[in-house]
Amino acid sequence: WDIDGNEYIDFALGDTGAMAGHRSPEVVTAIVNRVQELGGLTTMMPTEDAEWVAANLTERFGIAKWSFSLTATDANRWAIRLVRAITGKPKILFHSYCYHGSVDESLIITSPDGNGMNRPGNVGSPVDVTMTSRVAEFNDIEGMERELAKGDVAAVLMEPALTNIGIVLPEPGYLKAVRELTRKYDALLIIDETHTFSADWGGMTRRDGLEPDVFVIGKAIAGGIPIGTYGLSEELAARVLGRTDLDLIDMGGVGGTLAGNPLSMSAARATLEKVLTKENFAKMIDLATYYTETVNALFDKYDLPWSINQLGARAEYRFAKPYPITGTAAAESADHELEDFIHLYLANRGVLLTPFHNMALMCPTTTKADVDRHNLVFEEVIQKLAGA
């Protein structure tokens, strides 16, 4: 509800931060218990909840050792520092129009000549992004190899599907090829599933058998309480811990005073143990499939050159057909004026999509009736646009 008492169906869900839903009773109970009964909201010491959460993350994603932060952005930043220190290489390779929060190095896109340049809106960047980063188009394995072959890439940091420029899915074999290339050119692989966690209980990493050296996630795993985390493979963790010359205890540039605090850990345990379960994921994915199929049917009914992609519990349409397979092509398909009109029309009738793009996300309490309501209003939008 808003301050005027208007009720909304929320498909934005805090741009994934509320994928567990709003005010989940299990999460509320855990938070209240921590605040009122257990106390110690920030202690700089681990809790039993932290141990449980790390074990659950290992079960889900297959990664051995975990360290916590307050955002996935910070988890990415700290992972970048570690891989640079371990490899001795200065640059990180990204996909054009990727999303890794506000990490400076990630705000790079391919330029018209095929090289890198600052992404539009990269305000106040500390250095030219090409000094710290390299870039390739998603699904362009030749471009990926070209950049890795330059020999200065410490790691590829990637979403296994682009999520902030539409949902750009990997072409068959692409993710496996990237992993093979990182090994060929002695670079590490960091997979950020902060958004793509919607794919499955164990994200795309478990679903698709991915093998990252570093795994990053945040947003949804604590039910809306600030959290992020990065995990290291057994091999990489041993390399990091074996580097006694790295000051990782105090001023190493990795870690934070509030990271892993008891409140975040209590919320994360409740979310992972009782809300984002295998059963709820199955329900959420089924609803997203229904959303995708019914929205696509509207495109067909009105002969619109639009398309929609689904990634587990999320789906998103673009004003292009077929759906773009690179970040640049997806960016070129954007129509911000049309997007704003659709979002405003829906919002004025009680339906929220994710701002800045057309993503709909399901949570455990989303219903078929919610999707049907969206479709009813969305068809009204289409009719107005088509002059029907």
Label every PLM stretch briefly.
Residues 1-388:
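Conserved N-terminal phosphate-binding loop of PLP-dependent enzymes in the Aspartate aminotransferase
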